[in-house]
C-alpha cells in the first residue's frame, strides 16, 4: 500500500525536488549550521566565509541585537548586556543558576515560575529568547547560502539535557521561526557523521568535550543501526572551565585581581588565547596589564588534569553501563573544540588504548551529522536504511503501596519507547488513584527523584483488587515523557507530560547510580520488608471486612483465635522483621481457613437460591 504524503498548502515539494533542511549544532561556545548538497555534507559559511558563529548575543541601544563575532567584540566593553554561554542557563531555575554559576556578570530577575531573566538594556530576556537570537542568525545564514526557505532543522543537544532543557530548546527554535524536525543528542549526531563516512561496524566511543558540556556515548554500529548502549557526561564541564583555571592561575601568579566585570571578561579572553596557542607551542608568553610571564604546556596540563580525569571517570562508568570493556571499543571519536588540546587526546588515547579518530573536524562533526539526519527526516532520502536508537539515562517508575518503586522503563532503554503496566486498587470502594512518577535506580520512592503526580478519578467503586488501571509511559524521540492512566471498564483516563522545572547534573546522576550500587543489599532488604508490610495490611483489611459481614459464621473460640492472630500480625507489621511478618501472615491464614470455607459455602448457597439444577 502506497503512503499518501500530506503537507501544508505551499509547502509540498515537486516530485524529486530537493527539500532544504539543515542540521544545527547549538553550542555553548560556538554554533554551526550544515546541510547536504549533491549527497555531500557541508558547513554553511557566514558572509566572511567563517564556519563558526560564536554563541554570543549583545543587546544594544534602540533594541539593536548583535549576534556572533560582532557581539563577542562588545563582550569586554559591555559585559552586562552581552550574554555568553546561554546554553548553560537554558531550562534551569534561577536558584539553580545562581548556585552553579555565582560569578556570572549578569543582573538576574526571576520570572513568575522561578526561571531566570537576564536584565539587559533592551529588557529582561529569558535564556530561551537569547537562544532564539542565535538560531535566527543561523537560519538567516542558511537561507542566504541555500537561496530558499527551510523545510526544517535538526537541532543537537547534550545527551544529558533533561525534559525542561529540551523543551526550552524547542521553544527557542519556534521563536526563531524554525520547524524542528527533531532534537538529536550531540554524540549521536557525531556517530551518524562517522558511521556514514567510514561504514565501520562495531563498538564506538564518542568523546564530546565542547565549550560548556561533556558527553560520552558508547554506541554499537551494526548493519546500518546506530544503537546507543550507554551515555554519560557532565553538563558543567568544558573548555570554558579550562579557560577559568588558566585565568585563576594568572591572577595567582601576577597578584593582580580583575576589578570589574570588564576586566574579568578580558582576563578570560586572554586565557582562551593562551589555551589555543599551547596546542601548537610548548611555552607561551603572557602579558597581563603590567605583568609579564609565561606558561608552559606542562603547567597547563597540570591545571586541567583534574577535569580531564573527571571526564574519564564518566567514560569508565559508561563502559560499565554498556557492559563492554575498553578493549572491545573499535574506534574513539573526538568531538568538540576542546578535544584539540593535546593532553586531552593523549589521556583519552591511553584510557581506550587506541588513537582517537579526528579525521572530521571536531568542531564540525556534530553539525554535519545533524545535517545528514535532517536530510533523511525531510524526505530527501526515503530509502535510507539507517536506524537511530537513543536511550534514557535513568529508569522511570511509579510508586506502589508501601513506598515501593515499580520500574516501568529501565535505564538505557532505547527511545522512542512505550511501556504499559496494570495496577489495581488497595481498598474496597476506592474511586481515585494517585499516580506518582519517579526517576532513579533505588527500590524505595524516598530514595528516588520525584518527577510529577496526577490523580485518576472516576474509578467505579469495587472490591479491593477488582479495578484494572492501565498506566502507560511514553518517551518520544526527544526524550519527553507522557504518562497516561486509564480505568479499563469505563475508559476514564488522565494524563500528564513531564517537564521538570530544572534537571539533574551528571554529578547527581552519578550519585544516584552509585547509591543504587552501594545500597543494593539494603535496598532489596527494605523492599522485601515493605512488600511483606503491604501484604500484611492487605490481609488484615480483608479479614476485618469479612468479619464485619459474616461474624455470625464463627463461634466465640474461633473469633477469639482470629482476633488474636490479627493483633499479632498488626504488631509484627510495625516492626522490621520480614520473616516474622511472613510467618504472621501464615498464622492468620491458618486461623481463617475454616472461616473462608464457610463464607464460600454461604456465597454459593446465596447464588443458588431460587434456581433449579436445570437452570445451572
UniProtKB/Swiss-Prot annotation:
SUPFAM superfamilies: Actin-like ATPase domain, Heat shock protein 70kD (HSP70), C-terminal subdomain, Heat shock protein 70kD (HSP70), peptide-binding domain
Pfam families attached to this UniProt entry: HSP70
Superkingdom field: Bacteria
CDD domains (alphabetical): ASKHA_NBD_HSP70_HscA
GO biological process: iron-sulfur cluster assembly
InterPro entries xref list: ATPase_NBD (IPR043129), Heat_shock_70_CS (IPR018181), HscA_NBD (IPR042039), HSP70_C_sf (IPR029048), HSP70_peptide-bd_sf (IPR029047), Hsp_70_fam (IPR013126), ISC_FeS_clus_asmbl_HscA (IPR010236)
ATP-binding listed as a keyword: yes
Keywords (A to Z) from UniProt: ATP-binding, Chaperone, Nucleotide-binding
Membrane-spanning ranges: none
Function recorded in the entry: Chaperone involved in the maturation of iron-sulfur cluster-containing proteins. Has a low intrinsic ATPase activity which is markedly stimulated by HscB.
Protein family per UniProt: Belongs to the heat shock protein 70 family.
Protein name as it appears in the record: Chaperone protein HscA homolog
